Amino acid sequence: MIYPLSIRSFFCSRVITAVLLALLFTGCSENSAPDTETQNREITMNELAERYVKLTLAVGQHHDYYIDAYYGPEAWREQDKQPLGELLQLGENLHADLAKIDATNHEKSRHEFLTIQTESVLFFIKHLQGEQFSFDEESKALYDAISPTIDESEFDQALAELDDLLPGDGPLNQRMAVFSKQFEIPKDKLDTVFRAAIKESRQRTRQFIDLPTQENFTLEYVTDKVWSGYNWYKGNSFSLIQMNTDFPITIDRAIDLASHEGYPGHHVFNSLMEKHLVNANGWIEYSVYPLFSPMSLLAEGSANYGIDVAFPEHERIAFEKEVLFPLAGLDSSKVDLYYAVQAVRSKLSYIDNVVAKRYLDGQIDKQTAQQMLMKYALSSEQKALQRIGFIEQNRAYVINYNLGQDIVRDYVEQLSKGNAEKRWQVFSELLAYPKTASMMRH
C-alpha cells in the first residue's frame, strides 16, 4: 500500500521502531529451525497444476479465443482481471517451481507436458504485451515445432501433375473449381450427408476406443467464419460441432470434417483426456485447453491423421461411392479421377505454412499472399481471402494441421509397424495421454 504524502510523517517513528526491533531479534532467529510445514514442504504436481489452470484462465481474459475449452471449477474462472505484467511474474514463478520438481516415473510425462505448456503461456503473455517474434520463433514457442522449409519447385511439380489431370484453358485454380463443382454437396443434402458420415466414423471409432457411455454432440451449421469446421468441447464428453457453409462443400469433406471434428478427432481427444486424466487421475491441468499451445499441434495433427486411421483409403472410397454419393445425389462416374486429383492436391498442403510465414514476417503483402494461395492452394479469390483471415487471426497455428499430422503419423506408424489394430491402440493411447511434438520425437 502507498500512503498519501500528508500522513507519511505519522508513520516515520513507527517505521524506525519496527526496523530496530527487527535488527534486535535477527540474532535470535538466524539459527532457529524453519517451519517445515510452510518453508520446506515439497510442492506437489497437483498444486502446480492448479496454479497453471488459474494462470491460463487469467490470460484468457486478455484474449477472446485463448481458452478453447474449460470444464474445471467454475469459481476459478470468475477472477478479477490481472495486468499482464503480474501474470508474467506468476508464470515465471510457476515455471521455476516446476523445475524444482523431481518427477517420479509415474508423473514424468505429466511434468514434462505441463512444463512445455507453461513455457507456451509465458510466450503468449509476451506476445500480448506487444513483443515481436518471427514466425518460426512463434511456432516453436507456442507449438513446440518449426515447419520445414519447402522450395516452391516442389509445389510446381504437383501443379504440373494437376495440369495433366485437368487439361484445358484458363488458370489451373479455375479449372479445379469447374471440376470440383460436380462433387459439391447440395445445400439441402448437407445435413443428411454429414450425419451419415459422422455415424459411420463414430461406429468405426467405437470398435477400437472405449468412449464414455454418455458421450454425445450437437451439430450446427454456421456462416461468416474463417474456419470450415469447429468443435467446441463443453465437458462431460459433450461437444458442439459447427460446420461453416460460407462456401460449397465437396463430398470428400464430409468424412474429413466428421472425423476431424468428431470421431476419432477433437471430440474423442477431449473426451479421453477428461475421462482418463481429469476424472480418473485428478490431473486438473487437462481441464483447460489453451488454444495457442503445444496441445493444439497434437489436437489438429491427430484429428487429421485420425481420418486415415478410421477410413483407410480403399474403405473410404468404397463408403463414399456406395453411401455418400447416393445420399448427395451425385454422379460417381468420375470418382476415380477425383480421388487422383485429391491425392496430388495433398502434396500442396504445406503452402499454407509458406504463405503464413512470409506474410507474417513481412516478406510479402496481402495481395501477394492471396495470389500465392490462388496459385498453389488452387483457391478462389474469396477462399484465399478467407484463409488469409484465418492466418491473421491464428498466425503460426496453421502448422498444426500439416506438420502436426506428419508428426503424429510418424509417431504412431513407428510404434504400430503397419498393424491396423496396433495403430488404433497407439493412436488412442496418444489421445488419452498427450505428448507434445518434441515428446513424440524423443
What is the predicted function of each stretch?
Residues 1-12:
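N-terminal secretory signal peptides that target proteins for export/translocation
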Residues 28-442:
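N-terminal maturation segment of proteins
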Residues 15-26:
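Bacterial N-terminal signal peptides
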Residues 11, 24-25, 294:
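Generic secretory/membrane-interface signal
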